């Protein structure tokens, strides 16, 4: 019995000694590439990049959404639903997946291209909500207003294409509400009216490193 007690005490001592070797309040990242800070300007750039790019590696790669990354961009998805069913476009390859319903204005939620558009708009709204929630009070009002404009643009496309939107203005774990028709229109109108005085003058960035915003 004495030997068992001694062995147990020794094991407990070694365990406590091992645990105390690390000062939990002063641990540095093991990976030297790891950083707890980030460049806010790069985060701002991502908000604008979401209009044209589809992922994290420039023109393609590590896509924002699963599926055919090339079909998932903001401009392309909005263009598909707005223009492919008009006289401005003649799409000769009607055997392409779900192309016939789109060109004949008979598309439904079963269409991959419709889903990509809906998901792209929802993803971008979430991206903008995160930026606005985390940076309001830290960045100038005009920069926050820019992203509020981009968010309103996505909600406008929701209204134009689907007449409704999963509506949310905060970045948290709560599910969005739904705004439909005139309610969504009124919010967009009020939001744009509210941010207009905060926006930079037209051409304010033309001679700066921020050209293109």
Regions found by a protein language model. Give the residues of each.
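Conserved, well-structured interaction surfaces
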Residues: 54, 90-162, 175-186, 192-208
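Bacterial Sec-dependent N-terminal signal peptides
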Residues: 1-29
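Non-transmembrane alpha-helical segments in soluble domains
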Residues: 44-48, 189, 196
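Short linear capping/connector segments at secondary-structure termini
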Residues: 31, 167-175
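An alpha-helical repeat/solenoid feature that recognizes helix-turn-helix modules
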Residues: 212-213
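Membrane-proximal, proline-rich intrinsically disordered regions
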Residues: 21-75
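Outer-membrane beta-barrel and related beta-rich outer-membrane complex signature
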Residues: 59, 162-166
